[in-house]
């Protein structure tokens, strides 16, 4: 059950931004798992369950971001993302359906809806 993000979450994210390397991350992996990954997974699954309950005829796809950056796109940045997010969209097609999202970083959180349609 999602109980919220903590001060430890913000502190971990801030420290990750300042120490974005594998040795630091491995030393702090337990904090990541406890204060960021687990709450994000719980929140995403609870929001998804509510969407399924409210819209039983419209299956949704849930995507939870990974902490690891794509190694092909580092461009001088560290190997870990400095934000974590999840999104969900109707699985029938992108056309006409919105994507809901939530994201968190060291200083803020974002929530919203995005609509995309071919021109």
Identify the role of each PLM range.
Residues 3, 42-47, 64-67, 79-82, ...:
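A short linear-motif detector with a strong N-terminal bias
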């Amino acid at each position: 059950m999602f109980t919220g993000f903590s001060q430890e979450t913000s502190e971990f994210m801030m420290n990750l931004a300042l120490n974005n390397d594998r040795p630091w991350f491995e030393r702090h992996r337990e904090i990541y798992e406890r204060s960021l990954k687990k709450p994000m997974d719980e929140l995403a699954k609870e929001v998804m369950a509510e969407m399924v309950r409210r819209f039983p005829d419209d299956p949704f796809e849930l995507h939870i971001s990974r902490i690891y950056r794509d190694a092909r796109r580092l461009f001088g940045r560290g190997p870990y993302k400095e934000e974590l997010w999840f999104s969900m969209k109707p699985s029938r097609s992108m056309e006409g359906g919105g994507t809901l999202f939530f994201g968190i970083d060291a200083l803020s959180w974002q929530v919203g809806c995005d609509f995309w349609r071919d021109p």
